[in-house]
From Swiss-Prot:
Biological process annotations from GO: translation
Keywords, alphabetical: Ribonucleoprotein, Ribosomal protein, RNA-binding, rRNA-binding
Keyword hit for RNA-binding: yes
Family label: Belongs to the bacterial ribosomal protein bS18 family.
Protein name, UniProt field: Small ribosomal subunit protein bS18
Cellular component, GO, one term: cytosolic small ribosomal subunit
Length: 78
């Protein structure tokens, strides 16, 4: 098996919330929450977004609350 050849150097992902100084994630801020949801409506994992564990937990709670209040869909339309 050959190793990886060429390609780009891996860039470290930075947490969006710590970089922008956001301490509170509001479930009513739908535009912000949509950045962390896939086109199918699923919550994107930390390894994709680069969000820290602390803010990933807060983000998950906010997305679930927004879904409960019908601000975000549970599944995306096809």
């Amino acid at each position: 098996m050959a190793g990886r050849k060429g390609g780009r150097a891996k860039r470290r992902k930075v947490c969006y919330f710590t970089a922008n100084g956001i301490t509170h994630i509001d479930y009513k801020d739908v535009d912000l929450l949509k950045k962390f949801i896939s086109e199918r409506g699923k919550i994107l994992p930390r390894r994709v977004t680069g969000t820290s564990a602390k803010y990933q937990r807060k983000l998950t709670v906010a997305i679930k609350r927004a879904r409960q209040m019908a601000l975000l869909p549970y599944v995306a339309d096809e």
